[in-house]
């Protein structure tokens, strides 16, 4: 069985995240959206809200599930029997950052990282940009799935 972990904070889930997940469904038997929890980090949306956004967005996709975790992603992969880490790439800076992590993960384990390029229509979207638009009272509805719009 081809099982992938898609890790992130998803604060909040964006159309970019959603696009990567949708496009990965035919590639894997199971996709686990893994929300990383870091006690040192301040989040705009609660963990429960972030889980709800993802569950609602993918409610009709039985191969997609959501969990939260702490610690190393490769440890989570080993625990859940996942052989792949799924990552989206928006730009060259993402690639350089993700490449270093992928090489480290590969050195520490046998887990492969699979990169998908974001669609041109969503390549400019990041959770940071969405949070900034929200903080400044802007219309963020064109940047996020429907489930996030009705917070």
Swiss-Prot record:
Entry keyword annotation includes Nucleotide-binding: yes
| Catalytic activity line of the entry | (R)-4'-phosphopantetheine + ATP + H(+) = 3'-dephospho-CoA + diphosphate
> For binding ATP, which residues are annotated in this chain's numbering?
9-10, 17, 88-90, 98, 122-128
- Associated pathway: Cofactor biosynthesis; coenzyme A biosynthesis; CoA from (R)-pantothenate: step 4/5
Q: Which cofactor does it need?
A: Mg(2+)
The UniProt GO MF terms for this protein read: ATP binding; pantetheine-phosphate adenylyltransferase activity
Q: Residue span of the signal peptide, if any?
A: none
Record-level GO cellular component terms: cytoplasm
The places in or outside the cell where this protein is found are: Cytoplasm
Q: What is its EC number?
A: 2.7.7.3
Site-annotated residues for Transition state stabilizer: 17
GO biological process per UniProt? coenzyme A biosynthetic process
Keywords (A to Z) from UniProt: ATP-binding, Coenzyme A biosynthesis, Cytoplasm, Magnesium, Nucleotide-binding, Nucleotidyltransferase, Transferase
Q: Which CDD domains match?
A: PPAT
Q: Which family does it belong to?
A: Belongs to the bacterial CoaD family.
What task does this protein carry out? Answer: Reversibly transfers an adenylyl group from ATP to 4'-phosphopantetheine, yielding dephospho-CoA (dPCoA) and pyrophosphate.
Q: Which NCBIfam families match?
A: coaD_prev_kdtB, cyt_tran_rel
Q: Which HAMAP family match?
A: PPAT_bact
Protein's UniProt name: Phosphopantetheine adenylyltransferase
Q: Which organism is it from?
A: Flavobacterium psychrophilum (strain ATCC 49511 / DSM 21280 / CIP 103535 / JIP02/86)
Species lineage, top-down? Bacteria, Pseudomonadati, Bacteroidota, Flavobacteriia, Flavobacteriales
């Amino acid at each position: 069985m081809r099982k992938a972990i898609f890790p992130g904070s998803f604060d909040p889930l964006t159309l970019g995240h959603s696009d990567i997940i949708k496009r990965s469904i035919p590639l894997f038997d199971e996709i686990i959206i893994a929300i990383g929890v870091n006690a040192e980090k301040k989040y705009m949306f609660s963990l429960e809200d972030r889980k709800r956004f993802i569950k609602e967005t993918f409610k009709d996709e039985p191969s997609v599930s959501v969990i939260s975790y702490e610690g190393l992603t490769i440890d989570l992969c080993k625990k859940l029997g996942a052989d792949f880490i799924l990552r989206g790439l928006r730009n060259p800076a993402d690639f350089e950052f993700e490449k270093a992590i992928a090489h480290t993960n590969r050195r520490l384990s046998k887990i492969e990282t699979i990169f998908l390029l974001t669609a041109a229509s969503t390549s400019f979207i990041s959770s940071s940009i969405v949070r900034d638009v929200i903080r400044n009272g802007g219309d963020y509805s064109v940047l996020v799935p429907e489930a996030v719009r009705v917070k």
